[in-house]
Design a protein with these regions (language model features):
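Polybasic low-complexity intrinsically disordered regions
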Residues: 1-63, 70, 74
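A general marker of short, structured functional hotspots
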Residues: 2-4, 17, 37, 48, ...
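Generic signature of intrinsically disordered, low-complexity segments enriched in small/polar residues
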Residues: 6-12, 24, 55, 74, ...
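Generic hydrophobic alpha-helical membrane-segment signal
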Residues: 8, 37-39, 85, 107, ...
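Detector for Asparagine
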Residues: 27, 32, 54, 76, ...
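Helix-centered, glycine/charged polyanion-binding patches within enzymatic domains
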Residues: 45, 50-118
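Basic, amphipathic alpha-helical segments enriched in Lys/Arg and hydrophobic/aromatic residues
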Residues: 88-156
Length: 156
């Protein structure tokens, strides 16, 4: 059997709803995927992780697509954000990371067992759709205490 590694890059709203995603081979640099991920967007702000830090990427996104790329800077960074901004970014990133955690742990996105590329794409899309449907059901049920409760929907 042959296994292929992949990376899942996604855009989400600040409360965790997945709006778009791109899948790349595991050996591709994260910063290259940003261009594909943001292809149809203009004038948005993206909060990325440290894998997207690059001196050229942030100004290029800003000048070409009017996209602000924000990320938590390293502790020893000279031009770190003010404390209030860092706290806000941390809070938003925590919610976004929860969405990714739910995709991997509850919907097993990291274990897509398929025999073809079409099967891989289909299964991945279904898992993202299941996450978003769970998210919307939680919103409709007023379970919006900052966490989408996928297990609670399924198991009661």
């Amino acid at each position: 059997e042959t296994y292929f590694g992949f990376k899942f890059h996604a855009l989400t709203t600040v409360d965790g709803f997945l709006t778009d995603y791109v899948i790349t081979p595991a050996n591709i640099d994260d910063r290259n995927a940003v261009w594909d991920l943001c292809d149809k967007y203009r004038s948005i702000s993206i909060i990325g992780d440290k894998g997207y830090i690059n001196k050229r990427l942030t100004p290029e996104l800003k000048s070409e697509r009017y996209i602000d790329l924000l990320f938590l800077k390293r502790e020893n960074s000279r031009d770190n954000y003010p404390k209030e901004v860092r706290q806000l970014l941390f809070k938003v990133r925590r919610r976004i990371e929860t969405s990714f955690s739910q995709l991997t742990e509850q919907l097993n996105l990291n274990k897509v067992k398929s025999k073809s590329m079409l099967g891989f794409i289909t299964r991945t899309s279904i898992k993202v759709l299941a996450h978003n449907i769970s998210f919307l059901i939680n919103k409709l049920m007023k379970n919006d205490d900052s966490m989408a409760k996928i297990k609670r929907l399924v198991f009661g």
